[in-house]
């Protein structure tokens, strides 16, 4: 329900004014995303595609990602639930200037600011990249391990994922992450699907079973 309302708002609010003079064909979204950040990323992708602005918006989001990476305090600011309307508008203006004043992105930031969703920006950036990659025939997969994997293991994992129905006719883009907290095993994420065979996950399931009343 909220997802549908969010997309309607994207089309009815500031973006609608910028697109009112164009009768663009319906945009085909390359992959379905879930979660609130996925909903907003899809709305931004659709708006940018209608404006023939995908490459520009992609570049602007890359700059925005750099802002968050280089200035960790920005994430803390946008996550502050006590920001006033004026504060949020200031944040939107500063972020807009940082990425070069991209009109589509500025309107989008205004919408999510009005909806108190500025904290979702990092997730939206990631999901937007997933959409762009999918439109190019790229299928992203992230493999998380407790320690760095050797080349032979990486090649085996890559071959297994590339040959799966998740990738199909697309081209696999493999991202590797290391997280010692999973203790061992792997967590494989392909698009919106997650396969968790980590030791930490198994321990959590065991603890759950042991805590259940007999």
Swiss-Prot record:
It comes from the Eukaryota. Gene3D superfamilies: N-terminal domain of the delta subunit of the F1F0-ATP synthase. It is a peripheral membrane protein. Transmembrane segments: none annotated. GO terms for molecular function: proton-transporting ATP synthase activity, rotational mechanism. Residues 1-24 form a transit peptide. It is found in: Mitochondrion inner membrane. F-type ATP synthases have 2 components, the catalytic core F(1) and the membrane-embedded component F(0), linked together by a central stalk and a peripheral stalk. The central stalk, also called rotor shaft, is often seen as part of F(1). The peripheral stalk is seen as part of F(0). F(0) contains the membrane channel next to the rotor. F-type ATP synthases form dimers but each monomer functions independently in ATP generation. Mitochondrial membrane ATP synthase (F(1)F(0) ATP synthase or Complex V) produces ATP from ADP in the presence of a proton gradient across the membrane which is generated by electron transport complexes of the respiratory chain. F-type ATP synthases consist of two structural domains, F(1) - containing the extramembraneous catalytic core, and F(0) - containing the membrane proton channel, linked together by a central stalk and a peripheral stalk. Belongs to the ATPase delta chain family. This is ATP synthase subunit 5, mitochondrial. It comes from Yarrowia lipolytica (strain CLIB 122 / E 150). The lineage of its organism: Eukaryota, Fungi, Dikarya, Ascomycota, Saccharomycotina. The gene is ATP5.
């Amino acid at each position: 329900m909220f997802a549908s309302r969010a997309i309607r708002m994207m089309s009815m609010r500031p973006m609608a004014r910028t697109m009112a003079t164009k009768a663009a064909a319906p945009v085909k979204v390359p992959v379905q995303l879930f979660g609130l950040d996925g909903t907003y990323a899809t709305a931004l992708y659709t708006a940018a595609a209608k404006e023939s602005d995908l490459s520009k918006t992609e570049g602007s989001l890359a700059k925005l990602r750099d802002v968050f990476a280089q200035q960790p305090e920005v994430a803390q600011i946008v996550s502050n639930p006590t920001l006033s309307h004026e504060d949020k508008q200031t944040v939107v203006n500063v972020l807009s200037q940082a990425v070069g004043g991209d009109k589509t992105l500025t309107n989008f930031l205004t919408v999510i600011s009005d909806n108190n969703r500025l904290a979702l920006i990092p997730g939206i950036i990631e999901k937007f990249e997933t959409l762009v990659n999918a439109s190019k025939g790229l299928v992203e997969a992230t493999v998380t391990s407790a320690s760095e994997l050797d080349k032979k293991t990486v090649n085996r994992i890559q071959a297994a994922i590339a040959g799966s129905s998740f990738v199909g006719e697309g081209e696999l883009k493999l991202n590797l992450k290391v997280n010692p907290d999973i203790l061992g095993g792997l967590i494989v994420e392909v698009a919106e699907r997650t396969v968790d065979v980590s030791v930490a996950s198994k321990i959590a399931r065991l603890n759950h079973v042991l805590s259940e009343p007999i």
